[in-house]
Amino acid sequence: MASIDAFSDLERRMDGFQKDVAQVLARQQNHARQQLQQFQAEMRQLHNQHQHLIDELQRLATQRTALQQQIHAAQQATNTTREQWRSYHERESELSRRQSTLAAQSRELDSLLQQRGKECVQLRARWAAQSGNDAAEVALYERLLQLRVLPGASDVHDVRFVFGDDSRCWIEVAMHGDHVIGNSHPALDPKSRATLEHVLTVQGDLAAFLVVARDMLLASL
C-alpha cells in the first residue's frame, strides 16, 4: 500500500514538474516571438524610411535638373543680373549636398535592412532548435538529478534549477543572451561560480553544468 501511495505521489510530482516546465518554455517561446515581431516591425519601419529617402532623392534630382535649366537660361538672358545668377548656383550647390547626404543615408539603411534580415533568420533558427530540444533534456535531467525547473525570482527569462525535494538547494541562470549565473542557495564562492560559468558559457555543456552545480551546492549545505 505504501508503494502505491509513493507511486501516486511521484506521479503527482511529475505532473507538477511537467506543468512548470511547460510554463517556463512557454514564456521563453513567447519572448522569442516578441523579439521576432519587434524585428519585423523595425524592418517595416526601415523599409518605409528607405522608400521615403528614394522618393526624396528623385524629387531633388528633378528640382536640380530644373534649376540647372534655369541657370543656363539665366546665363543666356541679357537682363539677368550677376547676383541672381550667383543665387541660382548657391541653391544648386545646396541641393547637390542634400542629395549626396540622402544617398549616403539610403545606403546605410539598405545595409541595416540586410543585417536585420539576417538576424531574423538566425532568431527563427535558434527558436526552432531550442523549442525542439528543451523538453527532452529537462525530462532526462529530472530523472537523473532529482531536478525541478522553476521560473527565476527576479526575471521572467531566468530559470531556477532546484535539486531535491526541500527547495533548499537551487541555482538560477539567465537563459536569454549570454548564460549568466544568478543567485543560488547555498551561496557559492567566486571560484565555484567562475567554474560553473566556464562550463555553461565556454563549453556550452548544460548537462555537465547541472551535475557540477548539484555537487557544489550539496557540498555547501
From Swiss-Prot:
Coiled coil: 9-112
Assembly and interaction partners: Component of the NDC80 complex, which consists of TID3/NDC80, NUF2, SPC24 and SPC25. The NDC80 complex is formed by two subcomplexes, TID3/NDC80-NUF2 and SPC24-SPC25, which are joined end-to-end through their coiled-coil domains. It has a rod-like structure with a length of 570 Angstroms and globular domains at either end. The TID3/NDC80-NUF2 globular domains are probably directed to microtubules, the SPC24-SPC25 globular domains to the centromere.
GO biological process: cell division; centromere clustering; chromosome segregation
Function description: Acts as a component of the essential kinetochore-associated NDC80 complex, which is involved in chromosome segregation and spindle checkpoint activity.
Keywords: Acetylation, Cell cycle, Cell division, Centromere, Chromosome, Coiled coil, Kinetochore, Mitosis, Nucleus
PTM sites of type N-acetylalanine: 2
Nucleus as UniProt keyword: yes
Additional free-text comment from the UniProt record: Present with 3280 molecules/cell in log phase SD medium.
UniProt similarity note: Belongs to the SPC25 family.
Keyword Cell division among record annotations: yes
Record's compositionally biased regions (Basic and acidic residues): 83-97
Natural source organism: Saccharomyces cerevisiae (strain ATCC 204508 / S288c) (Baker's yeast)
InterPro entries per the UniProt record, alphabetical: Spc24_Fungi_globular_sf
GO CC entries: kinetochore; Ndc80 complex; nucleus; outer kinetochore
Protein name (database record): Kinetochore protein SPC25
Gene3D superfamilies the UniProt entry points to: Chromosome segregation protein Spc25
Signal sequence, renumbered to the chain: none
Subcellular location: Nucleus; Chromosome, Centromere, Kinetochore
Region: Disordered, residue numbers: 76-101
